[in-house]
Amino acid sequence: MRLIIRPTYEDISKWAANHVAQKINEFSPTKENPFILGLPTGSSPIGMYKNLIELNKNKKISFQNVITFNMDEYIGIEENHPESYHSFMWNNFFSHIDIKKENINILNGNASNLKKECEEYEKKIKSFGGIMLFVGGIGPDGHIAFNEPGSSLTSRTRIKTLTQDTIIANSRFFEGDVNKVPKNALTVGIGTIMDSQEVLIIVNGHNKARALKHAIEKGVNHMWTISALQLHKNAIIVSDKNATYELKVGTVEYFNDIERKNFNNDLK
């Protein structure tokens, strides 16, 4: 696993955006051979999305031949609800770039058969040969997507009950009212994410420091689902300084030393 540590959230957002753009550009996608990109929601990737929008406006990256799969969606709220993940993605990213609507895939939390919706999502990912780069964030308890503590590390796309901690954390998007937050969601599984060719996780803030410690310095543990990345052959965590405060000094120095040449990844 690689750990890229940069001073601020703005720095890691720029780094993540540049990394995504570089991967797409290196692949040189076409209509017949598209790039398959996994995407997250939440506060962590917003800065990355802003940077990718600018790169797209400046014609340094195109999304015309990129197919996206989002990580998750709430169950029981309409797609046009202001806090649905459909709305989040269109408001914060898709409506600002040159992606084709038919290339966007987001789970339908109002499907008549939710189990079938999850199964079909997995099949569609496999039909494209799998996800090439899956970008994600984590919660303070180390969850990826809605794979809460205790989730199977081989889990697939499924229905998931949200923990009270996640409901409280997400209430900030629902006028601070926990009663307005959906209690269930559809989410890709840890196994789904681990099948990707590459995983990039954005970690920022003091409240993520304990989760980062479990990801980097502790063993693989289903109570900290982020720790599964230790088993991935091509995983990167990009973290701001605030999120590293529970890591050992030697750990931080080690990763800073071996990744120093990769701190600046600006597009040429």
Swiss-Prot record:
Pathway(s) this gene product operates in, as recorded in its UniProt entry: Amino-sugar metabolism; N-acetylneuraminate degradation; D-fructose 6-phosphate from N-acetylneuraminate: step 5/5
Catalytic activity: alpha-D-glucosamine 6-phosphate + H2O = beta-D-fructose 6-phosphate + NH4(+)
Signal sequence range: none
Record's keyword terms, sorted: Allosteric enzyme, Carbohydrate metabolism, Hydrolase
HAMAP family per UniProt: GlcN6P_deamin
Function: Catalyzes the reversible isomerization-deamination of glucosamine 6-phosphate (GlcN6P) to form fructose 6-phosphate (Fru6P) and ammonium ion.
Family: Belongs to the glucosamine/galactosamine-6-phosphate isomerase family. NagB subfamily.
Protein name: Glucosamine-6-phosphate deaminase
Protein species of origin: Borreliella burgdorferi (strain ATCC 35210 / DSM 4680 / CIP 102532 / B31) (Borrelia burgdorferi)
Source organism phylogeny: Bacteria, Pseudomonadati, Spirochaetota, Spirochaetia, Spirochaetales
Gene field: nagB
